[in-house]
């Protein structure tokens, strides 16, 4: 009588973790293979990295000297209240907007920099 796949699976299922570890090592030695996961190289490699980013985050790095003006611009951009906008400006670096287009991110950056802030687009 031949051993079936089901018999093997049932036998393996009843083993402890230590016994399974020993079994894997025995397979590696007997057949000269490794149970390590193989890293598959992406076929799109450099092309994927060259793909242009479509969503950007606008980060307020610092408010600079014109804090009041920066708070006003943050309020206008985000629609937040005075306290919330002040907390963002005081807590810099903080993300002002997430997932915006490149044009919108550059527009926000321009407004904030004109108010005296330092801004990063990520």
Swiss-Prot record:
SUPFAM superfamilies tied to this protein: ClpS-like, Ribosomal protein L7/12, oligomerisation (N-terminal) domain
Q: Which cysteine residues pair off into disulfide bonds?
A: none
What highest taxon heads this organism's lineage? Answer: Bacteria
What CDD domains does its record include? Answer: Ribosomal_L7_L12
NADP listed as a keyword: no
Keyword terms of this UniProt record: Ribonucleoprotein, Ribosomal protein
Biological process terms in GO annotation: translation
State if Ribonucleoprotein is listed as a keyword: yes
- Which InterPro entries does this UniProt record tie to the protein? Ribosomal_bL12, Ribosomal_bL12_C, Ribosomal_bL12_C/ClpS-like, Ribosomal_bL12_oligo, Ribosomal_bL12_oligo_N_sf
| Annotated GO MF terms | mRNA binding; structural constituent of ribosome
Q: In the UniProt record, which is one GO cellular component term? A: cytosolic large ribosomal subunit
Function recorded in the entry? Forms part of the ribosomal stalk which helps the ribosome interact with GTP-bound translation factors. Is thus essential for accurate translation.
Q: Which PANTHER family match?
A: 39S RIBOSOMAL PROTEIN L12 (PTHR45987), LARGE RIBOSOMAL SUBUNIT PROTEIN BL12M (PTHR45987:SF4)
Into which family does the record put it? Belongs to the bacterial ribosomal protein bL12 family.
What quaternary structure, including any partners, is listed in this protein's UniProt entry? Homodimer. Part of the ribosomal stalk of the 50S ribosomal subunit. Forms a multimeric L10(L12)X complex, where L10 forms an elongated spine to which 2 to 4 L12 dimers bind in a sequential fashion. Binds GTP-bound translation factors.
Q: What is this protein called?
A: Large ribosomal subunit protein bL12
